[in-house]
């Protein structure tokens, strides 16, 4: 390889002035040489291509970030129809519904969990969730909706059920309300997990002919995949939401673009730790795909990287 080819891009200092915009700052990240800053720039450029192209954009994420202010970022992406498909976990329903009606509170990682238990406060990282802001309010809101839906028909697909929950919540702060409003399907492969999952189980125990047909969700996903000209994905964290996203994309020879934000490492062979490079071997990401792995806290990186698109 020609030495000059390796030395054609000098490292430039970041220079911030009072009028510097976030997109200008991210542009400077791209010329700064290292380390995660350059990856944030690469992710921004890939996401810009996703949003500007005629392609189907997937957004996958775990539930924990919905307990934080990052919920507002996800909600804006949905509200502005910048994403076409959401794949997440059942806790997203829990936190989205609960926070529509009750507050969560800023806490700390370092506190006596035994004391919190005695006080009726649950800790999610450094977010404090009072008992009254979680299980009871979810039951209070979800069970009457299930009663209504059951009277309408006995069997629902998962994504249709989520739309119906969002429709009845009818609150602009809610992700699932805006997903319903914009007809963006929300897929939850692990539908029976979490508090809303427990409500579904409880309702089933009282109404044994009630059904959630998750294979209808898979049918809907297959239609989306096979109709897509191109696909891109913004994947936050790993687990089932990431895997279901890349799993379905293997049936069209892989994603065309992908941005993966994670703190997990690949040494243990986990799906969460697996780099996008590994997904190429499984045909879940295309060989010629444009992609980047960004290591860091999604509650910092995601708002920064998508802020220019939300102005």
Curated annotation (Swiss-Prot):
Pfam families: DS (PF01916)
Alphabetically ordered keywords of this record: Hypusine biosynthesis, NAD, Transferase
InterPro entries: Deoxyhypus_synthase_arc, Deoxyhypusine_synthase, Deoxyhypusine_synthase_sf, DHS-like_NAD/FAD-binding_dom
Names of required cofactors: NAD(+)
This protein's record includes keyword Transferase: yes
Catalytic activity, as annotated: [eIF5A protein]-L-lysine + spermidine = [eIF5A protein]-deoxyhypusine + propane-1,3-diamine
Active site per UniProt: 284
Superkingdom as given in the UniProt entry: Archaea
Keyword Transmembrane (UniProt): no
GO CC list: cytoplasm
Biological pathway: Protein modification; eIF5A hypusination
Biological role stated in the UniProt entry: Catalyzes the NAD-dependent oxidative cleavage of spermidine and the subsequent transfer of the butylamine moiety of spermidine to the epsilon-amino group of a specific lysine residue of the eIF-5A precursor protein to form the intermediate deoxyhypusine residue.
Record family assignment: Belongs to the deoxyhypusine synthase family.
Protein name: Probable deoxyhypusine synthase
Organism: Picrophilus torridus (strain ATCC 700027 / DSM 9790 / JCM 10055 / NBRC 100828 / KAW 2/3)
Gene name as annotated: dys
């Amino acid at each position: 390889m020609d030495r000059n080819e390796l030395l054609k891009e000098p490292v430039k200092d970041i220079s911030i002035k009072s009028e510097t915009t976030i997109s200008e700052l991210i542009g400077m990240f791209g010329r700064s040489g290292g380390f995660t800053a350059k990856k944030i720039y690469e992710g921004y450029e890939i996401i810009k291509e996703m949003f500007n192209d005629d392609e189907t954009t997937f957004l996958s994420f775990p539930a924990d970030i919905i307990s934080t202010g990052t919920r507002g970022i996800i909600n804006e992406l949905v509200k502005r129809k910048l994403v076409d498909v959401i794949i997440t976990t059942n806790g997203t329903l829990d936190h989205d519904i609960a926070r529509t009606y009750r507050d969560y509170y800023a806490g700390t990682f370092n506190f006596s969990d035994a004391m919190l238990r005695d006080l009726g406060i649950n800790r999610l990282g450094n977010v404090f969730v009072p008992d009254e802001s979680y299980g009871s309010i979810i039951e209070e809101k979800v069970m009457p909706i299930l009663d209504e839906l059951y009277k309408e028909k006995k069997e629902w697909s998962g994504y249709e059920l989520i739309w119906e929950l969002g429709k009845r919540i009818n609150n602009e702060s809610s992700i699932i309300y805006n997903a319903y409003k914009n007809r963006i399907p929300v897929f939850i492969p692990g539908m029976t997990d979490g508090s809303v999952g427990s409500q579904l189980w409880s309702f089933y125990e009282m109404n044994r002919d009630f059904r959630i047909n998750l294979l209808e969700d898979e049918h809907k996903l297959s239609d989306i995949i096979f109709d897509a000209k191109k696909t891109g994905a913004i994947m936050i964290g790993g687990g089932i939401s990431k895997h279901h996203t890349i799993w379905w994309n293997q049936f069209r020879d892989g994603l065309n673009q992908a941005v993966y934000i994670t703190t997990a490492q690949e040494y243990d062979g986990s799906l969460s730790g697996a780099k996008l490079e590994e997904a190429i071997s499984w045909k879940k990401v295309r060989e010629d795909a444009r992609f980047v792995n960004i290591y860091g806290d999604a509650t910092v990186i995601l708002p920064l990287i998508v802020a220019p698109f939300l102005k």
